[in-house]
């Protein structure tokens, strides 16, 4: 069985279709508005490194820069970065995730300036919405929540969601 996600971005709305063996399985249509909701995934640009905080500020398109701490990069950050480069190298051709290679895990006690630099593009997900004068809070550990499971690319564990 082959699965395919088709995303159509128009000026006023975004349509997402899930196809399995060329048959439509699921379809969603959402209005396109500039809301920064928890779970949204962006390719963002590092604006400013803050070595004292071991963090950085990242531009995701919001009026204020988002905050990304080193510990929130996630252990598979290097794998995401390599995959992002491979996908961006030829945007006309789909790079299958099955061909992505897993990189060594990020050190837990490392420094943000050894991993990121200003102007670098990173794949991030919003974990906390903007509040008052603060921008969104980000993570580099991407996850896709479904009805019965949560997909974490490059992850080694399999866990199920239990409902009582």
Where do the model's predicted regions map?
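Single-stranded RNA-binding surfaces
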Residues: 1-163
């Amino acid at each position: 069985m082959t699965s395919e996600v088709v995303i159509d971005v128009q000026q006023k709305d975004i349509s997402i279709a899930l196809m399995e063996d060329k048959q439509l399985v699921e379809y969603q249509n959402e209005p396109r508005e500039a809301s920064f909701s928890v779970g949204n995934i962006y390719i963002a640009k590092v604006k400013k490194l803050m070595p004292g905080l071991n963090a950085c500020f990242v531009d995701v398109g919001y009026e204020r820069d988002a905050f990304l701490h080193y510990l929130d990069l996630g252990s598979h950050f290097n794998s995401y970065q390599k995959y992002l480069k491979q996908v961006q190298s030829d945007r006309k051709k789909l790079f299958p995730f099955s061909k992505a290679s897993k990189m060594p895990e990020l050190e837990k006690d490392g420094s943000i300036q050894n991993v990121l630099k200003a102007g670098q593009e990173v794949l991030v997900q919003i974990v906390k919405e903007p509040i008052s004068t603060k921008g969104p809070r980000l993570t580099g550990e991407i996850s896709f929540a479904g009805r019965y499971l949560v997909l974490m690319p490059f992850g080694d564990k399999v866990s199920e969601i239990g409902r009582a």
